[in-house]
Amino acid sequence: MQKKEKIRKMFAGISRRYDFLNCLLSLGQDRKWRRFAVSKLPEGLVLDICSGTGDVAIEASGKNDVVASDFCYEMLELCSSKISKKGILNASCIRNDAENLSFRDGTFDGAVVAFGIRNVADIRKALSEMHRVVKKGGKVVVLEFSRPTNPFFRAGYYFYFRKILPVIGRIVSKKDGAYSYLPSSVMAFPQRDGFSKLMEGSGFSDIKYHDLTFGIVTVYTGSK
């Protein structure tokens, strides 16, 4: 099975427990991380890629018109339901593949992807698509897990991340693979300078990154 289809099925299987597990496993820090990422977006029309259940899109809708996109129908269904229940009128949902976006060149003032870029089959292609659909002078924001830099904190965090988190995730979601996949995917993901170089290679400039919560996550920004 190709990685793309495997990932889609995995997220479809955990979609109903996804929000609860995000909050539980991050000890509530995920909300703070999303707020910080959204604060880096420009005002205007924003594309939320790999939107999942729509938390970033909902956060961004406070100051932006938002299009939430995801390739997993089950996730997008929850996203649409949450937006509707909150009475948000300036956000919409559309099924879309991060590696092959259906939007015209230069459609958006900004784009954001939170905890999704590491899951795409071709990271360079997804970044190039983000670059394509953002206007000249527009900005992109990427929020992703990182490996902590402090050696003392890192040791304890790795134990939690590799041993405890998958067990909790498996019990709550009743799915074996999803939360075992998370640690392995984070360990394989290019870190800080490495990912910044991928962004640069996709055409972005003025690339910066900000570590949050002892480097558990990193927010990357870049301009077109």
Please identify what each model-predicted range represents.
Residues Y18, A111-V112:
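Hydrophobic beta-strand segment of the Class I
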Residues E99-G110:
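A short acidic, Gly/Pro-enriched loop at the edge of an enzyme's catalytic core
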Residues E5, R147-L198, K208:
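C-terminal alpha-helical "lid/dimerization" subdomain adjacent to the S-adenosyl-L-methionine
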Residues G138-F145:
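Conserved beta-strand signature within the Rossmann-like core of class I S-adenosyl-L-methionine
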Residues S26-G44:
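Conserved alpha-helix/loop element of class I SAM-dependent methyltransferases that forms part
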Residues S196, G203-K224:
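Core SAM-dependent methyltransferase catalytic element
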Residues R124-K136:
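A short glycine-rich, Lys/Arg-flanked "PGG" loop and its adjoining helix->strand segment in the class I
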Residues L45-N100:
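Class I SAM-dependent methyltransferase SAM/SAH-binding core
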